[in-house]
């Protein structure tokens, strides 16, 4: 059985101020990722040890309050700015199911303003029983895993084609731009 609910009725949010990184001296050798909900997602890594959000134990969605971009996070992290919300699932809700559902929401975010409280949290979704949510997540995870594998294959084939072209051009004394 499915029920129609508002996002704000199934997700709690936390202001991220406690988890904001204090310096931006990032280094790949550091352990803790610094996140943004935008395109880049992982901005770098910090060696700061205090006030780390523990998403490895309880996954969350980070939600950019201005762009409405969101990312599913299941590892410990710090964040870059307070322009996001950390969304947590309430009991009986699979956070990853909600994340997948949010990726399909069409939303006009053209104005420069915060959206979660005023508008986005009021968007309604059909939510099935938790067992069905978990089954859907399992299926979608598998599809995404296959897609990621296929993308890697395409990249490797593209590199192979380029290298074959270069080899051919060298063999035939052609110029390669």
Which residue ranges define each predicted feature?
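Non-catalytic DNA-recognition/assembly elements of restriction-modification systems
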Residues: 1-19, 24-40, 124-137, 149-177
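DNA target-recognition domains and sequence-specific DNA-contacting regions of bacterial/archaeal
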Residues: 5-125
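A specific heptad-register position in long alpha-helical coiled-coils used by two-component signaling proteins
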Residues: 141-144
């Amino acid at each position: 059985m499915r029920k129609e609910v508002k996002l704000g009725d199934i997700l709690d949010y936390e202001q991220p101020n406690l988890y904001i990184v204090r310096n931006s001296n990032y280094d790949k050798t550091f352990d803790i990722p610094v996140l943004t909900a935008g395109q880049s997602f992982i901005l770098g890594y910090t060696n700061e040890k205090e006030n780390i959000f523990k998403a490895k134990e309880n996954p969350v969605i980070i939600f950019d309050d201005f762009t409405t971009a969101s990312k599913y996070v299941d590892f410990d992290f710090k964040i870059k700015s307070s322009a996001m919300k950390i969304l947590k699932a309430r009991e009986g809700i699979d956070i990853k199911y909600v994340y997948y559902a949010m990726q399909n929401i069409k939303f006009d975010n053209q104005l420069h303003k915060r959206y979660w409280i005023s508008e986005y949290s009021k968007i309604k979704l059909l939510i099935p029983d938790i067992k069905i949510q978990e089954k859907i997540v399992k299926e979608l995870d598998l599809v995404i895993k296959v897609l990621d594998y296929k993308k890697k294959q395409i990249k490797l084939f593209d590199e192979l084609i380029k290298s074959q072209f270069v080899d051919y051009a060298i063999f035939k004394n052609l110029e390669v731009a």
